[in-house]
Structures are given as structure tokens and as C-alpha cells.
UniProtKB/Swiss-Prot annotation:
Belongs to the centrin family. Functions as a component of the spindle pole body (SPB) half-bridge. At the SPB, it is recruited by KAR1 and MPS3 to the SPB half-bridge and involved in the initial steps of SPB duplication. Also involved in connection with the protein kinase KIC1 in the maintenance of cell morphology and integrity. May play a role in vesicle-mediated transport, in a VPS13-dependent manner. It comes from Saccharomyces cerevisiae (strain ATCC 204508 / S288c). Transmembrane segments: none annotated. Keywords: Calcium, Cell cycle, Cell division, Cytoplasm, Cytoskeleton, Metal-binding, Mitosis, Nucleus, Phosphoprotein, Repeat. The modification Phosphothreonine is found at residue 130. It is found in: Nucleus envelope; Cytoplasm, Cytoskeleton, Microtubule organizing center, Spindle pole body. The gene is CDC31. Ca(2+) 2 binds at residues 142, 144, 146, 148, 153. This is Cell division control protein 31.
Length: 161
């Protein structure tokens, strides 16, 4: 299998990525290389990219495969996946990432994170928190005193500002 991470240990991309980001790329590839052949086909690539937070149109994914597929097999090997995803991760706008995270909490699209939203996320993460604990979390960061966390308050939490 071509998932040899040591071959990618040199180069500018490698020095810019955090260890956690490198691990996420490796895990996404490994998880979605369904037949363990060391390559991702279109469908595997699409879900691996989505797992890393990137949803590209079909045409763009096919173009990426064509760009890196020197053998005409319509597959992407790990080294190429690492390069493509590493570059995409480094180009991410941190503010966009925070806003995307906010949307995961705000599943009812009210523009605010309520105790109900927080309870759902805690449950999804396997955390058992009382309403009192959830309320305390919201009160800690609720700058306008409305009992909920709006997007600006969430951004402030995530950026320590």
C-alpha cells in the first residue's frame, strides 16, 4: 500500500501542517480506502474529503483525480491525497471554520445556540450534563444576556477575544 507517511516528511507542506492535521489526513484516507488497495476511487475520495470538511462538486473531484492519476486508473494514491488535502487545509479561513462549527450547534437555524442545542451536542458526544451545567456554560459566554449564544459570541469563545 502506498500510505507511506515517511515519504512525505520533508517539504514545505509537511512543515506547515500541524501533527493533528497530518493525522486527520492519514485517518481519512485509511478509513475510506474501503478495499485497502492504497487508492481512493471517486466515491471514496468524495467521502474522505467530506470527512475533512470539504464538499466539492463532482466535476472538481473528477478533475483532481485526473490531475494526479498518471496511470489512467481514475484513482488517487495516498501521497497525492496528502498533498491535495494538506493544501486545502492550509488555505482554510479560520473564521469560516468557526462559522461552520456554529452551524453544527445551531441545527434549528435560529442564529443562536440554546440549551436545547447544547444538550443535543453533548448527547451526540456521549457527555451527560445537567441542565444546570449547560445553563452555566451558556451564561459564561452570553455577552448580551439573552440566555443563548449568538454567532458573534461563539466566534469570541473560539478566538479568545
Amino acid at each position: 500500500m502506498s500510505k507511506n507517511r515517511s515519504s512525505l516528511q520533508s517539504g514545505p507542506l509537511n512543515s506547515e501542517l500541524l501533527e493533528e492535521q497530518k493525522q486527520e489526513i492519514y485517518e481519512a484516507f485509511s478509513l475510506f480506502d474501503m478495499n485497502n488497495d492504497g487508492f481512493l476511487d471517486y466515491h471514496e475520495l468524495k467521502v474522505a474529503m467530506k470527512a475533512l470538511g470539504f464538499e466539492l462538486p463532482k466535476r472538481e473531484i473528477l478533475d483532481l483525480i485526473d490531475e494526479y492519476d498518471s496511470e489512467g486508473r481514475h484513482l488517487m494514491k495516498y501521497d497525492d491525497f496528502y498533498i491535495v488535502m494538506g493544501e486545502k487545509i492550509l488555505k482554510r479561513d479560520p473564521l469560516d471554520e468557526i462559522k461552520r462549527a456554529f452551524q453544527l450547534f445551531d441545527d434549528d437555524h435560529t442564529g443562536k445556540i440554546s440549551i436545547k442545542n447544547l444538550r443535543r451536542v453533548a448527547k451526540e458526544l456521549g457527555e451527560t450534563l445537567t441542565d444546570e451545567e449547560l445553563r452555566a456554560m451558556i451564561e459564561e459566554f452570553d455577552l448580551d444576556g439573552d440566555g443563548e449564544i449568538n454567532e458573534n459570541e461563539f466566534i469570541a469563545i473560539c478566538t479568545d477575544s
